[in-house]
Every structure is written in structure tokens, then in C-alpha cells.
């Protein structure tokens, strides 16, 4: 299966654009709006927050997007859209989904709510044809799932541990309140896509100055692992991820005494994020890819949202 | 006489000194001895708390469930405490700990990150458990910042709040200023001080904390803890009593518990060894020690200089990669440009 080819070919030059709304105006919502703005296949029609003073709303206005501080209610009133991105919190998403579901919109959830179908583009493809709620797992999930999936497919992995470090100033309130959900959703994804049931997930929020670039360390127990073979598998997985998240790199990869340690780093490639915010960049890049491929899908019935 | 509550994390923070390998027999034996001395709170767990057994920091010898139930059974008078770091443990771990009969929960966060504890403090409050919030690496924040973070933690539901001198960097006036600012900010909420002994000041700092209004003071038998160790419990208690703070602890039984701890928990009691003194002076996480010594040795650089440079860069736990940069720079192999 040539997923990489599929992913890169999926950005059409000219097709009918998909109409898009974004809920949530934190750092992740702002970067999403920026990435949507750059995407020829997506037309951002509404950005909804809850605080009229938020910098995220002002940023969206500066790009010419319609904005509202009336949150989900405004999105429902202006519906239908082809795609609604939810960049709020896991608890908010669980409230939003029953309201959005009847509209037939594709909902792309960036919170660790575990509601929708989990997507890590290079592993799952972008989404099943009939998926209406696509879940992007978590930043640590996006960083680790391609590698743990590839490792477990090739080696008899018995235990997986995923330790991610996020800079404090790009961990907003929703992230801080959702640490349990992060751990649960990431663990569920790692187990689902590796088949390894014994997993441990850890998230560090680091206030270091200068801020630490987003890192994910994977520790795996692999009997008799061959270092060169592991490195080849990991490099191949990373190359695929770079097709949509170019700042994804393997910093270190060692195998000794049944213990494999892989250090991944994601540098943000974004108009609005600092380079260390790779956690937001990778999940948003995956989310926009899902929307772009949905927009390019033959036979898609377009929906119009509020005109801007 | 004023009262202080002694909180004893020997069986949790001490785990760092033995790679989290304390067995259930050792846990039970020390818990019984501390209980006999009427130590008010006995804390147990992996060194990084609930759910933290991992390849990243070390696999515990026993599960959280086994550790908690073993110590619970050993305590007749003392209350049972445990610890958690949000992002390492989860509410599921807290729920299970509650079911094991834990009385006092400590939620730890970096000094400037109280909001990371918001969810779990709220969870514990709603569950009716006693929850404390401790601000770690507190030398990296000013008294005013610590006071603000402490007040936030109280707003989230913390029933006691305080600071850990994780790097063992403070001198008594530093503690007086910080505890004073926190006491002023949180009013009647009990304030916690948890010392480390890198500069030999842990007991003196704890007395300064009590005099500045702290009402919960941490100490470990024989100072059992990573590097230079923690505040030495069996010295702390009589010194507090002589300073006018009642602890309710039986001194002879406490000395017996400390003797047992030295015999059964540790290869040797911790002392402020040279590298611990340097990391304390530099205000750097002592867990960097092995990596600093290893990399500096390989590059022919003085590891003491590496520690002081890491301190200037405000390196914190998790930034082990910075050690590589500093060693390379000090060895003259091309300075990096992204220094703070």
C-alpha cells in the first residue's frame, strides 16, 4: 500500500473548495485557521470562539474570515458546512458532537475525546468513506502511532512507552485540563495500531526557557532487536510522516538488550506557531490533510455555509 | 506551643535513591516503625508517584496497589499519603488510591505550573479526599510568583499548599521570604515545606519555614532521597521541638524507625557529595548528575563547570539534551547559538 503517494497526490490544484468552520481560538485553532487559509481546497467561512477579545478571533479576522464569539451556537446557526474542526476540549467536543451529527457535516476533532474514528494519516489513511467524526487522537499520538505501528508490524514488541514533552506556553487551558484524556486516548491509539496491550503514556509540560521543541520518546521492549533493522523501519515511517508534517525527524534510535529507544522531534512549519510548537503543528497538519482529501473526494455534495 | 504536622515521604521520595526498588517487606517494616513513632502522615509510592513506574524513570519493584495496601495495613495511627504528577498518573490512579484508603494526596507541579493540577485537585475535592498541591523546583520562581501559584492551587481545591526545594538550593532567608509570601497569599490554608540537603541546610531551612508560618514540614528517615537526600526526619523533629513547635512524635520510637530505615531501606545514608553540592549551588535538577559526569568525562570538561552553565541556562528536568550542548560548548567544539 503506497500511502505516501496517496497522501501527496491528494492536494488538488483546482476543484470545488470545501466550506469550513473552526470552533476554538486557542493556539491550535489559530494555527488551523492559518493552515486552512493556505490550503487551496478549503474555504474558511466561520471561526467561532467564546471570548470576543481573543487574539485568535482577531487573527482570523485579519485573514478575512468571518468570526463570532457565540461558539457552537453560531456554527449551528450558520450550518451546513462541509467540514467543522473542533479545537476546543474533550468535554466540549462530547457536547458538540450530538449537535453536529444530524447536520451530515464531516467533523474533525482535535481533542482527545475518543468519540470519533481515530486517524493517523500514514497508518489509517485519512478516513473511511462513511466516517462523519474523525478524531486526531493527540499530539503524542500523531507523533508515536506511525512508529509504533511500523515497529510492531516488523518485530515482536511486548511493551511500549511513549513519553512526550510539550513547551508550557503552547499548552493551553484545555490541554492542561485534558491530561487524563490525553493519556487515555494516546494509550488507546498506541494499543489499537500496534496490537501491544501493555503500554504506558506520559506527558511532560515543560516551562524551560528557551522552550523545548516538541519531543516524543518511544521505549519499546523488543526481544533480540537488531539496531540497523529497527533504524530502517523507523526511518521509513518518519519519511512517510514528513509527507504532511515536514518538521518530523528521528533524533536518535538505539537498540540494546531488548530495549529500543527512539527519540522523535517535531519542529513546527507554520505561519503563526513558534518552531518549538511541533505538537500543534503535527496534529493540525494531519487534520487539514483529512479535510483536503475529503474536499477532493469525487462525488462529494458541497454544502454552503454562511457567506463571508 | 505551636503545632506542625510532620509529613514523611521516606517510602516515596527515598525510592529515587534505590531506583524505585523498595520491596513490600521493607515498606511494611518502615511503615510500622513510623506508625509506632506517631508520625502523622506516611507517604508511599514510586518516586514519581502514582502510575509513574516506567522505563523512562525506573520500574517499581511493586505495583501501586500492592504498595498502598501493604502500608495501609501497617498503619494504625498514622495517616496514609501518596503522590502524583499530572501527566504521569491519572484520575483513575487517584480513584484506585482512594479505594485503598489513602488519606492525603500530594499533587506535584513545576513551580510556575499550578494550572496543571487544576483537574486533579478538583477531582480529589469532589471525591472528598484531602489534597495538597506542592510547587517543585521552587527556587526557579520568585516569592511573588510562588504566592500567586499557591493561591491558584487553593482556588482549584488544594487544602494545603507549599514548596519543594527540589534542587536543595535555598538558604534560610530564601525560605523565609517564600513561605512568608505564600502564607500571606493563602491565609488560613496550611503551608508545606519540603527540603533537600545539597548544601547541608535542609533542617535549618525547615525551621525557617516553620518560623515563617509553614504548618506541614516534610522529612525522610536518615534523609533517604536522591543525591544529597532530603531533610533528615529524626534531626528535624527534635530541632523543631526545641524551636517551639510541637510535632506529637515519640522521639525514641522515631530514632528506632530511622535506625531501621538505615539498616533495611538503603545501602548507605545519603550525604552531600561533591556533585550534589555543585548541583545545589547551581540550582540544577540533581537527576542530571550521571549524564553530566558521563558526557563531561568523555569530552574532558570539568563537570562542575557544566552544572554551573546549566544553572545559568535554567535547565529543568527533561532537558537532558541541553547537557550535550553545554559540554560541546565548554570543550570548544563550536558554541551553539541558541543559548538563553
From Swiss-Prot, chain A:
Transmembrane among the record's keywords?
no
**One GO MF term:** acetaldehyde dehydrogenase (acetylating) activity
Question: Which domain of life does this protein belong to?
Answer: Bacteria
Question: Of which family is this protein a member?
Answer: Belongs to the acetaldehyde dehydrogenase family.
Q: Which terms under GO biological process does the entry name?
A: catabolic process
Naturally occurring in which organism (per UniProt): Streptomyces griseus subsp. griseus (strain JCM 4626 / CBS 651.72 / NBRC 13350 / KCC S-0626 / ISP 5235)
What is the name listed in the Swiss-Prot or TrEMBL entry for this protein? Acetaldehyde dehydrogenase
Q: Which annotated residues bind NAD(+)?
A: 25-28, 279
SUPFAM superfamilies documented for this protein: Glyceraldehyde-3-phosphate dehydrogenase-like, C-terminal domain (SSF55347), NAD(P)-binding Rossmann-fold domains (SSF51735)
As recorded in UniProt, its EC number(s) are 1.2.1.10
Question: What is the catalytic activity of this protein?
Answer: acetaldehyde + NAD(+) + CoA = acetyl-CoA + NADH + H(+)
The annotated active site, in chain numbering, is 139 (acyl-thioester intermediate)
Which Pfam families does the UniProt entry name for this protein? AcetDehyd-dimer, Semialdhyde_dh
Stored HAMAP family: Ac_ald_DH_ac
The entry's keywords: Aromatic hydrocarbons catabolism, NAD, Oxidoreductase
Curated annotation (Swiss-Prot), chain B:
Indicate which residues the UniProt annotation says bind substrate.
Answer: 12-13, 166, 194
The entry's Mn(2+)-binding residues are 13, 194, 196
Task: Please indicate if the UniProt record lists Zinc as a keyword.
Answer: no
Q: Which residues form the active site?
A: 16
| Alphabetical list of SUPFAM superfamilies matching this protein | Aldolase, post-HMGL domain-like
The Pyruvate carboxyltransferase domain covers which part of the protein? Answer: 4-255
> Domain of life, per the record?
Bacteria
Q: What is this protein called?
A: 4-hydroxy-2-oxovalerate aldolase
Supply the source organism for this entry. Answer: Streptomyces griseus subsp. griseus (strain JCM 4626 / CBS 651.72 / NBRC 13350 / KCC S-0626 / ISP 5235)
Classification of source organism: Bacteria, Bacillati, Actinomycetota, Actinomycetes, Kitasatosporales
